[in-house]
């Protein structure tokens, strides 16, 4: 079987699929993405991989196949809009766990556009290492719990 055929068939290369909001216009979206990266770094790629959220509504066969083959499907959203959960569900998958940072770690959403015209700030000035760690810990727990 060719690599392309394996992708399309959904050969399970990662035990668990993680789908994340990574909205770069707010602190919650950025924190969600960073926490997922940290969780995969801690767990290893065999245990969990951040999947291509855009591949679900566009019917990218490898993304659909790998999601079908995953033991768990975990969504991580920054805010109550829950875009990643909704996209995953609209693609026909039921998340095993749905993490929402504003709900689950009490994070307050801040739009990066609030500071436009008030001086230049780096994106990371909006991010709390403590909130990234709390979110990462929730993701790791969701992957590891039986």
Segments (PLM) and residue ranges:
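Iron-sulfur-associated redox domains of electron-transfer enzymes in respiratory
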Residues: 1-146
